Curated annotation (Swiss-Prot):
Family: Belongs to the TrpF family.
Species this chain originates from: Methanothermobacter marburgensis (strain ATCC BAA-927 / DSM 2133 / JCM 14651 / NBRC 100331 / OCM 82 / Marburg)
CDD domains, per database record: PRAI
Keywords annotated in UniProt: Amino-acid biosynthesis, Aromatic amino acid biosynthesis, Isomerase, Tryptophan biosynthesis
Top-level taxon of the source organism: Archaea
PANTHER family per record: N-(5'-PHOSPHORIBOSYL)ANTHRANILATE ISOMERASE
Name of the featured protein: N-(5'-phosphoribosyl)anthranilate isomerase
Record-annotated membrane-spanning stretches: none
Alphabetical list of Gene3D superfamilies matching this protein: Aldolase class I
EC number per UniProt: 5.3.1.24
Gene field: trpF
């Protein structure tokens, strides 16, 4: 099981997340987000960590803008937000020859309607995030475990090779109380649950989280295939 720290906006938080052993570090380029960063800032912060750890979160559906973001940041792992599976497939067709990694965020709910009839062509992973009040993620709300498990089973049945990440308001307390449940996922995505304010990570919470995670049996070998 891998750990992703997302919504990073400060140099000191990036450096700490990397040093604590987080596998993936996410930088958000979406203007509606309180953690939005301009591409120049993303490039500066992501330069502090190994290339394979950086993830660029974007909600644009325009391939040209995605290519611009890749060119300006140097990040080759892209997380698509507020984009349909069909659109993600078209983006993949445009980027495939370049060898970039695409992951797609699914807002929960709705549930099975997200994936029925879709093949997720070219998508290497899916991120389950909570939807609320018209927002398709970034709500800071926990996904009901029954909903997430329903989607996980459907995804596993369709394509066992797809990496499935659980996001949505995750905290250390929740992980401790639901250890068996969260261990079913390939990756856990932490953002608001380890913050004192939007984009401001709590260093004590981060350290406590990573210390706990490193002791889990499912954590063994997590970095072997990022």
């Amino acid at each position: 099981m891998k750990i992703k720290i997302c919504g990073l906006t400060r140099e000191e938080d990036v450096v700490l997340a990397d040093s604590l052993g987080a596998d993936l570090l996410g930088f958000i380029h979406a203007r509606r987000s309180p953690r939005h960063l301009e591409l120049g800032d993303v490039a500066e912060l992501s330069s502090l960590i190994p290339d394979e750890k950086a993830v660029l979160v974007t909600e644009t559906s325009e391939t040209s803008r995605i290519m611009e973001a890749i060119d300006k940041t140097g990040i080759e792992r892209i997380q698509l937000h507020s984009v349909s599976p069909e659109t993600a497939g078209k983006i993949h067709e445009s980027l495939h020859a370049e060898g970039y990694s695409l992951e797609l965020t699914l807002a929960v709910p709705p549930l099975s309607s997200h994936i029925c009839g879709h093949e997720f062509q070219g998508i290497s992973g899916l991120i389950l995030d909570s939807a609320s009040g018209g927002r398709t993620g970034g709500t800071g709300k926990i996904i009901p475990p029954s909903d997430a498990l329903e989607l996980l089973a459907l995804i596993r049945g369709m394509d066992p090779s797809l990496r499935v990440t659980l996001a949505g308001g995750l905290t250390l307390e929740f992980v401790r109380k639901n250890r068996e449940y969260v261990s079913k996922f390939d990756c856990l995505d932490f953002n608001s649950g380890i913050e004192t304010g939007p984009g401001v990570k709590d260093h004590e919470m981060m350290a406590e989280l990573m210390n706990y995670i490193e002791g889990l049996p499912t954590r063994k070998g997590a970095i072997e295939e990022i």
